[in-house]
Design a protein with these regions (language model features):
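NAD(P)+-binding Rossmann beta1-loop-alpha1 motif at the extreme N-terminus of oxidoreductases
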Residues: 1-60, 64-67, 93, 98
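Rossmann-fold dinucleotide-binding core
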Residues: 8, 101-156
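Alpha-helix N-cap/helix-start capping motif
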Residues: 14, 38, 69-73, 103, ...
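Class I S-adenosyl-L-methionine
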Residues: 25, 42-46, 76, 110-114, ...
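A short acidic, helix-capping loop that chelates divalent metal ions and anchors anionic groups
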Residues: 41, 75, 130-133
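Acidic, glycine-centered active-site loop in nucleotide-sugar glycosyltransferases
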Residues: 45-48, 81, 90-92, 133-136
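Short low-complexity, flexible loop/linker segments enriched in glycine and/or proline
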Residues: 46-49, 66-68, 113, 135-139
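Rossmann-fold NAD(P) dinucleotide-binding segment
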Residues: 55-119
């Protein structure tokens, strides 16, 4: 399936995020990536992604922003902090966090996204890096139905 024309921001290109972003690049999406560990971005950039300079940078022009990050504190910083993705995203865009985080912090992000007119999906994954490389992770998404419908082609 071609994802050509889809503008995606991706935050977190570690062991799982990097191969997940590669799948979108391989299917034709225009992907900008950011990771505070700059070395983590090299594989995605080699695959065709644009290296972003910050969370805000990769979210500024994206219709969809994905994050795959380690914990609650990082989610707060990425989504809600100074220069966070929600401050850069346009109303009508969709933020998808694919990390395993607490319901409380995810709820904080959901409330802020809703107030900004941004769809927010909680979409943790099940599977290994091998499955991520093959594009065969199980995604357990919840959130607004319209946001899910728009993201479904990207999940496949």
């Amino acid at each position: 399936m071609s994802l050509e024309g889809n503008k995606v921001g991706w935050v977190g290109t570690g062991n799982m995020g990097s191969p997940m972003s590669h799948c979108l690049i391989g299917d034709g999406a225009s992907v900008a990536v950011f990771d505070p560990a700059a070395d983590n971005m090299s594989a995605a950039v080699s695959a065709g992604a644009r290296a972003g300079s910050s969370n805000h940078d990769v979210a500024a022009d994206a219709e969809f922003v994905f994050s795959m990050i380690p914990d609650d504190d990082v989610l707060r910083a990425v989504a809600l902090g100074d220069g966070g993705v929600l401050s850069a995203m346009s109303p009508g865009s969709v933020y998808v966090d694919m990390s395993t985080v607490s319901p409380e912090v995810s709820g904080e992000v959901a409330a802020a996204a809703d107030a900004a007119g941004i769809g927010y999906l909680r979409a943790p994954v099940s599977g290994s890096t091998i499955l991520a490389e093959a594009g065969n992770l199980t995604i357990m998404a919840s959130g607004p139905e319209d946001a899910y419908g728009r993201c479904e082609p990207l999940f496949e």
